[in-house]
């Protein structure tokens, strides 16, 4: 018996996948996207697993669901889905979703070139540019980002003692900068980063507590951001972001870029109004910028923006059938 039919549009943002679910997800209860996120996880998480996990997805698959706006001033809402769960915010996911939604007329903007979007982390503003029927760039004015914990020392098997920072940019990130026991991203293979990252995330999660002061459902360290020397002309810095159980972001990571700009600002390395060009593990670039300064629960925070591009590459209809023994997906760990 068929459990559900889902109409999807597949794209990638600077190399990282975005599967937009354009139809098939039932209405979600809740007044805010934070509430709708919790409702989805409690009642419809099988949809996420079926569409993100193998055999229909893979360990790096991520996606989104476009929903009606929660706020009167918003154009639409976005629910972010990926192998690890439903993120409060996703930068590359927003860029891919906006590109796909505008090109396929899934969202009708109140103002051409500008969207207000409700997301679980809050409300964001997005500007986009077009050439003909194509969206050529998307700029996100993200939620406030801040340095949550500084100089956290942990012992990591296979690495030794390292000192890290934890910053919020829509998700909580462990940021590992070059030091005595970590020479920099350029000295490690992707396989080595994948092996070390879960150990770092677990150790830091035990050492510090991360709960967003404005929404306690946004909690816990979810990503590990490894830094290194840039290789692309014009890049300020390079990173590799680990998420889920065994995924490395192919894009420069939007919320990670926001978190890293917050870290740099807190340490006096980046000022309001300055640009930050972030390079991914495959060499793709996001253009970041500190648009202003604000506060989160009395703590200094930045107002970050991230700009990038996405490419739509296909439409597909996915059936989830109860008679399929792998109807709800699987992970090989």
Curated annotation (Swiss-Prot):
A GO molecular function held by the record: 4-hydroxyproline epimerase activity
Superkingdom of origin organism: Bacteria
Pfam (any one): Pro_racemase
SUPFAM superfamilies named among the record's database cross-references: Diaminopimelate epimerase-like
Protein family according to the UniProt entry: Belongs to the proline racemase family.
NCBIfam families: PRK13971.1 (NF010578)
Name this protein carries in UniProt: Uncharacterized protein VP1330
């Amino acid at each position: 018996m068929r459990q559900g039919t889902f109409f999807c549009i597949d794209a990638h943002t600077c190399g990282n996948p975005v599967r937009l679910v354009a139809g098939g997800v039932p209405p979600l209860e809740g007044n805010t996207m934070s509430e709708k996120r919790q409702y989805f996880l409690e009642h419809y998480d099988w949809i996420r697993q079926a569409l993100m996990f193998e055999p229909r997805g893979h360990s790096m698959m991520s996606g989104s669901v476009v929903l009606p706006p929660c706020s009167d001033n918003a154009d639409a809402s976005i629910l972010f889905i990926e192998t690890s769960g439903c993120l409060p915010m996703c930068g590359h996911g927003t860029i891919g979703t906006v590109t796909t939604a505008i090109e396929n007329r899934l969202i009708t903007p109140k103002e051409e070139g500008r969207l207000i979007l409700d997301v679980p982390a809050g409300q964001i503003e997005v500007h986009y540019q077009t050439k003909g029927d194509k969206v050529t760039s998307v700029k996100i004015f993200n939620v406030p980002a801040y340095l949550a914990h500084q100089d956290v020392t942990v012992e990591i098997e296979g690495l030794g003692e390292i000192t890290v920072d934890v910053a919020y940019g829509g998700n909580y990130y462990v940021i590992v900068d070059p030091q005595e026991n970590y020479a920099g991203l350029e000295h490690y293979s992707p396989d080595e980063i994948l092996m070390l990252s879960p150990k770092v995330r677990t150790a830091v999660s035990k050492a510090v507590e991360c709960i967003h002061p404005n929404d306690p459902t946004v909690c816990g360290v979810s990503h590990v951001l490894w830094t290194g020397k840039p290789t692309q002309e014009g890049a300020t810095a390079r990173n590799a972001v680990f998420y889920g159980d065994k995924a490395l972001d192919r894009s420069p990571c939007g919320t990670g870029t926001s978190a890293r700009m917050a870290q740099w600002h807190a340490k006096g390395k980046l000022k309001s109004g300055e640009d930050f060009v972030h390079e991914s593990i495959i060499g793709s670039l996001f253009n970041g910028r500190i648009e202003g300064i604000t506060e989160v629960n009395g703590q200094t925070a930045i107002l970050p923006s991230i700009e990038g591009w996405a490419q739509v590459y296909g439409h597909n209809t996915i059936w989830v059938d109860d008679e399929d023994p792998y109807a709800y997906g699987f992970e090989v760990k």
